[in-house]
């Protein structure tokens, strides 16, 4: 593994690494891996392929991605969806995504906070993908009832859905369940796709038009690691989220969870 670019951005140190043997590229920010992909920009992260597979089921054609990283999901969706919009606070992410991860220049990119972008826009989407992190945490304001209601107001009323990536360190980490609980204040249909028993995993919280969604399959295999991705997708399962959280004041905009 070699470092092919290193820079200090407003949001911390960024490193782009390359595996010489397999021609794989990795985007690391402040010590956390944000993206990993093959030379064609196809992601090596199973949760990205899960999101891609779920979007295919709802035939989403107009999609907003909040959070760019290396932009591998945008690269993959750019080949199929009619309109992709990506929002990220870090302008360097877009340059890196285009230079190393194959993000098409035709994809609309905005340097902005996801919530502020939605407040300034009247557009409604088929799907909104939330994959934004400060270090290893979802930004606090994106973990609120007000934020979810804002997202809901920008989704197509009949087919729109939210898909959110929520990191879990282990089975006792309640972050995915907390996120689902807060989301349920804005949507009637909220589901959780997870892999129990895996340390340091990505769970997906789904809300909106998600009742008919099935477990996703690998649709766009990368040049390597396809079997590993398929194995992890096969282990994913929808599970009941633990609804034992109470909001102190759901209308306040804060997370306000009583655990």
Region spans (language model):
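SAM/dcSAM-binding transferase cores
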Residues: 2-18, 34-38, 53-56, 198-259
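N-terminal cap/recognition module
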Residues: 32-46
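Conserved S-adenosyl-L-methionine
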Residues: 187-198
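Flexible loop residues that form catalytic
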Residues: 133, 194-195, 210
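General small-molecule cofactor/ligand-binding pocket signal
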Residues: 17, 108-110, 191-193
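A short, structured beta-strand/loop element
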Residues: 21-36
């Amino acid at each position: 593994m070699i470092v092919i670019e290193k820079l200090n951005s407003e949001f911390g140190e960024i490193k782009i690494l390359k595996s010489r043997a397999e021609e794989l590229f990795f985007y690391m920010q402040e010590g956390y891996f944000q993206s990993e992909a093959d030379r064609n920009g196809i992601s090596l992260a199973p949760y990205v392929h899960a999101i891609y597979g779920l979007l295919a089921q709802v035939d989403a054609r107009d999609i907003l991605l909040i959070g760019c990283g290396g932009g591998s999901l945008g690269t993959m969706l750019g080949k199929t969806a009619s309109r992709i919009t990506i929002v990220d606070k870090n302008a360097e992410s877009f340059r890196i995504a285009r230079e190393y991860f194959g993000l098409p220049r035709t994809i609309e990119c905005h340097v902005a906070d996801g919530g502020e972008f939605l407040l300034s826009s009247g557009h409604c989407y088929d799907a909104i993908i939330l994959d934004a992190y400060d270090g290893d945490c979802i930004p606090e304001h994106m973990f609120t009832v007000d934020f979810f209601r804002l997202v809901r107001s920008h989704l197509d009323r009949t087919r729109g859905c939210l898909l959110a990536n929520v990191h879990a360190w282990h089975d006792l980490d309640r972050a995915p369940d907390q996120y689902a609980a807060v989301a349920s204040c804005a949507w009637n249909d909220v589901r959780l796709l997870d892999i129990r028993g895996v340390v340091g995993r990505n769970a997906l919280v789904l809300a909106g038009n998600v009742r008919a969604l099935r477990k996703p399959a690998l649709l766009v295999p990368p040049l390597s690691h396809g079997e590993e991705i398929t194995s992890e997708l096969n282990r994913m399962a929808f599970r009941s989220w633990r609804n034992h959280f109470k909001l102190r004041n759901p209308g306040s905009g804060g997370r306000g969870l009583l655990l």
